């Protein structure tokens, strides 16, 4: 008689390039559990500083461990050279996250290669990437768009973080390093929001099969994470999750929804109902809604809601700006939300249509007085490059 075994989903997070490895480091520092961390880079020195479980320096023959020089083609070739090693590292994974900062060399060129290998191995493959700040220059922005389109073909689901939106919810004293840390934090919340649905035992269980149902071959997806406290904590958390200033599009029209509500042991059925109702009202009437509830006494009197929306109609997607990851609309240590009287910063609302105004995507003035013709020459420190 065979001994019964408990089978847990194997989740691996691959950070590739400077931005991806930085994001992985932040996830490790934040105590993200239940996943294996893998750092991949052409910059051997930066790789040494990572606390990832597995480290792989790629492109040794091409770059001699000195980085890709912000050239995506070098990043792609470096990953291809080590295809067999990447495949060995990813074997056995049920889900693979590929995280990177788009616009540089290693992340932009190498992420599609890693994602392709993961899918060939049968893993549910999720891309979580950043679109660069405008102050990083037109060339980097152009490379990022090309990289995003290529990565989209290699993953099941792609979540994009628009870095310029981080400037809209920060103040003028935010340093460049703090801006990049904010981007890392959002990448972390993107991965944490999905893995928590799987690895945290639930009062109403959400398992890996549920996540696969919504995210397999889903294309672009939206994700929101919100927290609330007080009498209306669950509904407040739900509204925060779907109305973050970082959210570039509404979840309206989503035909696949993953909804997870976490709270203390005093979480009531009515609270759960109100939170779910606030979100499902915005979704497609025939949406496939998969729901989970988790009791986590560590939250105290707070409630946390995680929403993943996918399966948008192609026609609807064409009218949206590119989807993005949303984080809680509550103020945190590293991300400061705008004051109530700050009317210059647009905050999307569940109850009103988002205005399609190009000015929404313009960042706060950074480096005023800089010669615009030379913005491609902006020197980003090596450890921040992809």
Predicted regions mapped to residue ranges:
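Tubulin/FtsZ superfamily GTPase core signature
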Residues: 1-386
